[in-house]
Design a protein with these regions (language model features):
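Short, intrinsically disordered/low-complexity patches at protein termini
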Residues: 44, 127-128, 206-207, 219, ...
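Short, well-ordered coil/turn segments that N-cap beta-strands
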Residues: 48, 90-92, 118-122, 142-144, ...
Length: 309
């Protein structure tokens, strides 16, 4: 279990049904002592990872966006308090998203608080177009991993994201000099033919990871068809590139994927807090529990009980 005394240390310890798990936020190294049988009463209470939508605001208009469009933004002091609580309860990392997290004015201050007062890894999902040398300086050392949304190259990228591809490549070069980073790719009929080019882009820019995200149904769009998902799985099977591939939970189908912590499931693994402060099982779930003055863990327990009832 994590505790307040480990604040600021890079290596985090977490215990659960799979054993004792050590995590180093600087390198992303995970070590699991699975021969240790830990009684359930000692299991870590917090989810392993929590994503937080800082704001619903975004300056792009991607056709497949499922982020809520109602104006909402989290208070920075609440965010810091939640990070402290999650850290003390054994969470390993928080991922800031949105909307677009770089539109959140106090992003550098919140990231620095987490870096200096907790052992949580900070990740961020961004379209990257607001990464300037100044913002990079403000975030350097306070963000452990940056996930950049890239669903195609050249004209397909520009059609979907509405920004010059050459500017994206410039931002990736800057980001790669300051942070470990990966690419997130929404896969649908339009982007599927660009997967080779996106994986080449990941390799040439120094990305460590390519996260493949079959498009989810949202706002009248049906999401990726079974044929697209089957073609994606075939592409993954044939892939021989140097960049590690990852898939979102529930997207692996019959693919043989590594499951290092098979017994840690559901809310033990992951939870999402939206920009209005509601804790949900994921950003795709429409219902949840508000995080009030009792904190994140109290909301988590209410959500668990609600699901049991
Ligand atoms: S960049 Fe992300 S949040 Fe913004 S419109 Fe596109 S998908 Fe939505």
């Amino acid at each position: 279990m994590g505790d307040a005394s480990d604040a600021g240390l890079p290596v985090k310890r977490r215990v659960g049904p799979d054993g004792i798990h050590l995590f180093d936020r600087r390198t992303g190294l995970n070590v699991l002592f699975d021969e240790v049988d830990v009684p359930e009463t000692q299991w870590t209470r917090a989810p392993r990872q929590v994503s937080i939508a800082l704001t619903n605001a975004c300056d792009l208009a991607c056709p497949f966006c499922y982020a809520p469009k109602a104006a909402a933004m989290l208070d920075a002091d609440r965010l810091c308090a939640w990070a402290d609580e999650l850290n003390a309860e054994g969470c390993l990392g928080i991922g800031f998203g949105g909307g677009e997290p770089t539109l959140y004015r106090r992003l550098p201050q919140v990231c620095r608080h987490v870096a200096e007062h907790t052992s949580l890894a900070v990740t961020m999902t961004t379209h990257a177009h607001r990464f300037t040398p100044r913002l990079i300086d403000a975030l350097a050392g306070a963000v452990n991993f940056v996930r950049v949304s890239v669903d195609g190259v050249g004209p397909i990228y520009e059609e979907l994201r509405g920004r010059p591809f050459v500017e994206l490549v410039q931002r990736l070069t800057w980001i790669g000099r300051a942070f470990r980073f990966g690419l997130n790719c929404v896969v649908n009929l339009r982007t599927l033919p660009d997967l080779d080019a996106v994986s080449d882009l990941a390799a040439t820019t120094g990305a460590e990871e390519l996260l493949l995200l079959p498009e989810r149904p949202a706002r009248g769009r049906p999401g990726s068809s079974p044929n697209v998902v089957a073609a994606l799985h075939q592409w993954i099977t044939d892939y021989r590139g140097p960049v590690a591939l990852t898939l979102g939970a529930g997207d692996s189908g019959s693919l043989p994927i590594a499951q290092p912590l098979p017994s840690e499931t559901g809310l033990r693994t992951y939870a999402h807090i939206d920009a209005s402060g509601t804790l949900r099982r994921s950003s795709y779930h429409s219902t949840g529990e508000p995080v009030d003055e009792r904190g994140v863990l109290a909301a988590l327990e209410r959500l668990q009980q609600k699901d049991v009832a």
